[in-house]
Amino acid sequence: MRWSRYFLYTTKEEPSETEAASHRFLTKAGFIKQVASGIYELTPIAFRVLKKIENIVRDEMDKAGAQELLLTILNPAELWKETGRWDYYGNELFKLKDRSDRDYCLGPTHEEEITDLVRKTVRSYKQLPLNLYQIHTKFRDEKRPRYGLIRGREFIMKDAYSFDTDEESAKNSYDIMVKAYKNIFKRLNLNILMVKADVGQIGGKSSHEFVAITKYGEALIAYCENCGYAANTEIVELKKPNVEKEPPLVLEEVYTPNIKTIEELSSFLNVAKSKIIKSVLYIKEDKPIMVLIRGDKKIDEKKLERLFGTDEFRLAEDDEVLRLLNTEKGFIGPFVEGKDIEIIVDNSLYNASNMVVAFNKPHYHYKNANIDFENFVDVAQVEENDPCPECGSPLKVAQGLELGHTFLLGTRYSLPMKAFFTDKDGVEKPVVMGCYGIGISRLIAALVEQYHDEKGIKWPLPVAPFQVLISCVNTSDDIQYSTSEHLYKSLTQEGIEVLFDDRDVSPGVKFNDADLIGIPYRIVVGKKAKDGLVEVVDRHTLKAVDVPIDKVLDYIKDILNVNGR
């Protein structure tokens, strides 16, 4: 492909509101164009990357025994109402009506539709196991789209669905898909952690995420370098501390004027934050719930969501605190006798002794309080150096970008949708399902996040839009241009993917653009061409080697073969 004819336009200007490196470089390099918030077009060069990613994913899915199909984008509401997700999925679900006033949604995921297809066709155990997948566009009305392709409202995804006769067979299908996912990420040269995850809106029995470490990811993960444990922080169980109760001290009522935060209280009373009970009042479906936690800990509202079984809860407003407890925020305490307020106590307060606690009296706290709590749950945010639940070693905590997600669904969809089969004894049973997603367009961003420097992208060879870039330094120089033409034809005839920069622009522009778009190998045809030499530059190592013109073809073929063409 000749750059002068290629639909590729880079820009020198720094794009606005591009925090993530992938968003910045993909925009500057002309790979993506924003249409609206969270909605992007892929230009031809990005489309080449996309297709290479798809082909790797497709190859591993096919090897795993999955069969490709294509489902619809427009889903009738009736299917989603069968599983209860029409309402449960929330505002992220794009809903619309047709001219006959029938309800539809733009599919964010396809458990309902694939289950409907299978229940219409699968009747016998002889038709199972079955694994079906598609690569298709999805839609989610993200509240806050950001970081370019990392978090959009329209995106391309591979979703697969397995159907089995029983739990054992379903687990086997799940393990096969997990292996396929590991192969995919290895072939993409992505550094990935497989972590235990919450089942979320998809539902089911268990799940895992495949996460790339980056500060622009929405997932917060905890991992142990000692035993290999890794999980989303929201499902890491922080156990009760191994502490003994202290001998009780005399309870004191202390004046704490306008002291409303844990930090202020700790400083004012000269006590550790771990010796303070923090009381937080939530409202869930008009019902007040008080959550107690140690002062040095934070509440993980994702854990609360799992505990409550809904995300429909919020912090109490000032007027609600006044009405329910006759106090103000900062002085809320767990003394609610005669009030219809549920109390939830975090594990961190197990055997807590001689604590500082508010008691619903403005500007006062108790010191040396000893409260006998009976029931404890884990609702604390995981923090760096918290003990690993498997081996007790200190945990590491990092942000991560979810690239793949696998779910062992069980009968979450087959039961309500009556997707039944008849077993060998003639007994009708629900199929046991799994589902498996990979964010295809998000992978483009993830690759750039892991492969870039200050100048631009450094594509791994398996997904690079082109394998080789030929930069003709001076297109007006007959020797340089004819040499570039010769190399372009020689390489393309060998099936090597080449972008020939034949533009009539300055060498500086060509070199800057070459670094920006990140093609793995660059052949620089400059002044040395008259001496029979060109320069071959490795974009990853920046190593430059002079190669005789008549040896370039063999040299390129050798490095492509060595590096996994």
Swiss-Prot record:
It catalyses: tRNA(Pro) + L-proline + ATP = L-prolyl-tRNA(Pro) + AMP + diphosphate. Transmembrane segments: none annotated. Consists of three domains: the N-terminal catalytic domain, the editing domain and the C-terminal anticodon-binding domain. Signal peptide: none annotated. Keywords: Aminoacyl-tRNA synthetase, ATP-binding, Cytoplasm, Ligase, Nucleotide-binding, Protein biosynthesis. Homodimer. GO terms for molecular function: aminoacyl-tRNA deacylase activity; ATP binding; proline-tRNA ligase activity. GO terms for cellular component: cytosol. The gene is proS. GO terms for biological process: prolyl-tRNA aminoacylation. It holds the Pfam family tRNA_edit. It comes from Hydrogenobaculum sp. (strain Y04AAS1). Gene3D superfamilies: Anticodon-binding domain, Bira Bifunctional Protein, Domain 2. Its EC number is 6.1.1.15. SUPFAM superfamilies: Class II aaRS ABD-related, Class II aaRS and biotin synthetases, YbaK/ProRS associated domain. It is found in: Cytoplasm. This is Proline--tRNA ligase. Belongs to the class-II aminoacyl-tRNA synthetase family. ProS type 1 subfamily. HAMAP family: Pro_tRNA_synth_type1 (MF_01569).
